Design a protein with these regions (language model features):
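Surface-exposed amphipathic alpha-helical segments
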Residues: 2-9, 16-26, 123-153
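Secretory pathway targeting signatures of secreted, lumenal, and periplasmic proteins
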Residues: 9-62
Length: 153
């Protein structure tokens, strides 16, 4: 008779279903892409982990420098420190930018944050192929202020 040691599984949830992961050692680097047809905008949410020697600011600056190398006509407003969430409980960095990539114009709001007491970084990019107006700014603001963080008080 062979005995199998049963490891504690982690349940991973997405909108459509959840599933058990047999190994709890996991780094979620997934990306979600949500489209809003009425405003013709897209929200991209990406996850990553900061290296031991990185801060939110240093990572954000490095990503901005990489973006400068990959696109043309990059213009952006100064990076702002903001607080987000339903209780304004998480500090984040926000940037409004526009650039050209190939024949496409890209206009975006970007937000980066590190979940408290972790090294997990989340980046949200709210993107449109035309200039962002008041309706898009309001939509973006509502998204930022509605963030509810698991385990953050």
């Amino acid at each position: 008779m062979t005995l199998f040691k049963r490891a504690i599984a982690m349940t991973y949830r997405i909108n459509e279903f959840e599933f058990a992961l047999p190994d709890a050692e996991l780094q979620d680097s997934s990306i979600n892409i949500l489209k809003f047809p009425t405003l013709d905008t897209t929200l991209i949410i990406s996850r990553s982990f900061l290296a031991d020697d990185e801060t939110l600011h240093s990572n954000f600056d490095a990503q901005l420098k990489r973006l400068e190398q990959q696109v043309s006509n990059l213009r952006y407003q100064p990076v702002q420190r903001v607080r987000v969430g339903t209780k304004y409980e998480v500090e984040a960095l926000e940037l409004r930018s526009q650039f050209s990539k190939a024949a496409d114009e890209v206009y975006q709001f970007q937000l980066a944050l590190v979940l408290p007491s972790t090294r997990k970084m989340l980046a949200l990019s709210y993107v449109k192929a035309q200039a962002l107006g008041a309706a898009e700014a309001e939509h973006w603001s509502r998204i930022k202020l509605s963030l509810t963080f698991d385990g953050v008080q």
